[in-house]
Curated annotation (Swiss-Prot):
Gene source species: Zygnema circumcarinatum (Green alga)
Annotated SUPFAM superfamilies: Ribosomal protein L36
The protein, known as: Large ribosomal subunit protein bL36c
Lineage top rank: taxon: Eukaryota
HAMAP family according to UniProt: Ribosomal_bL36
Amino acid sequence: MKVRASVRKICTNCRMIRRRGKVMVVCTNPKHKQRQG
């Protein structure tokens, strides 16, 4: 899980979602997991 100020899609499988008011990126590749913060 990477914590970044600006999250973005890295590949075509990445999906942007909101969980508990935080913007997150989930993907089939675990290295692409990101959370805004």
